[in-house]
Amino acid sequence: MKTKFFLLSTLLIGLLFACVSTKLEKSWADPSFSLKPSPYKKVLVVAPLKDAASQRIAEDKIVKQIKAGAGVQSYSYLKPTDTDEKLLQAQLLKDGFDGIIVMHLTDVEKSVTYNPGTSYGGWYGYRSYSPGYYTEDKTFLVETNMYSVKDDKLMWSGTTSSLNPTSLDKSMDEIIYAIKTELQKKGILEK
């Protein structure tokens, strides 16, 4: 009985992880940060996307995943007139921001795979045959960068890949989960 339960549990966990189509491909952290880790308490979230609705959805989802009160959407904080970098940095510091998360789509890779047909009917072959077919896969690469407002430099960078995403909502949730998990593991964001 225990063996059956263990096998069933293992199978269900395997199926659960097999459904996830997003993974963290690469990440880099500033070596100086690992010497003095202190989680960021308040971050500005920026997701420059093609349209304002998608940007709002993405930024809202990211802020929702970060610890309560730690994230602020750029669409509610930044003004179109905020073009001077030094003035903006001073304003961010004055308002208590210590980090900025910028997430953007960097590439969409397309690949075509030929899947050969199969024949049935034994050694004399081709009594019954299913034809081959082509499949096209799209991999969306999203880069996320974490900047220190005080030091004015990149502290962490990561690239996620999402294979054949079915919806923006699901893809964003998977990407944000992968990034949040990595940032918390590195001690950059609080758990």
Where are these regions (language model features)?
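Surface-exposed short loop/turn segments
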Residues: 85-150
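C-terminal/domain-edge helix-coil "capping" segments
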Residues: 20-40, 50, 131-191
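Short low-complexity stretches enriched in small and charged residues
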Residues: 3, 26-31, 53-68, 190-191
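Bacterial N-terminal signal peptides that target proteins for export
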Residues: 1-7
